[in-house]
Amino acid sequence: DECCAIPLCAKIFPGRCP
């Protein structure tokens, strides 16, 4: 989702990005 495109968000929610 859009969170994956944001490095900080992806770090906070690692399970959201494959």
Swiss-Prot record:
It comes from Conus pictus (Cone snail). The cysteine framework is I (CC-C-C). Alpha4/7 pattern. This is Conotoxin pc1b. It comes from the Eukaryota. GO terms for cellular component: extracellular region. It is found in: Secreted. Disulfide bonds join 3-9, 4-17. Keywords: Disulfide bond, Secreted, Toxin. Expressed by the venom duct. One of its GO terms (molecular function) is toxin activity. Coiled coil: none annotated.
